From Swiss-Prot:
Disulfide bonds: none annotated. The lineage of its organism: Bacteria, Bacillati, Bacillota, Clostridia, Eubacteriales. It comes from Desulfitobacterium hafniense (strain Y51). This is UPF0342 protein DSY2926. Belongs to the UPF0342 family. It comes from the Bacteria. InterPro entries: Com_YlbF, YheA/YmcA-like_dom_sf.
Length: 124
């Protein structure tokens, strides 16, 4: 079996997984409720902004962090929104685990220095 066939099998297994199916169902439920869908999108945008700031080692205002926490608290009161966030976490964790397994298998083909967990310096 070729590596491409194996990758296709992996993609199919991901689509057949409980994590994937649960996420798709939760996503469709969220899309059906425009108000909660907008809140989820707002939460995700704020979360992304904070993650980007952390990636570039920028200061994150306490207000932004508190706003994200407040929005998360509001979302978790709604069962459909809470289920969506939990399903999103589970599918993300599965994908990250698969990426980690592949990454560990190909460490020998990484550019010089990266195999020692050296990180390139980010210039801000």
């Amino acid at each position: 079996m070729s590596i491409y066939e194996t990758a296709q099998q992996l993609a199919q297994q991901i689509k057949e997984s409980d994590e994937y199916r649960d996420f798709i169902v939760a996503k469709e439920l969220m899309k059906a409720d425009e108000g909660h869908y907008k809140m989820i999108r707002d939460f995700q945008m704020k979360q992304f902004e904070i993650q980007q700031a952390q990636l570039f080692q920028l200061d994150i205002s306490q207000g932004k962090q508190q706003e994200l926490e407040r929005l998360y608290s509001l979302l978790s009161l709604n069962p459909a929104a809470r289920e969506y966030l939990e399903a999103e976490f589970r599918i993300s964790r599965m994908i990250n685990d698969v990426q980690k397994i592949i990454g560990e298998a190909i460490i020998d083909v990484l550019p010089l220095g990266f195999e020692d967990n050296d990180q390139p310096q980010i210039l801000a």
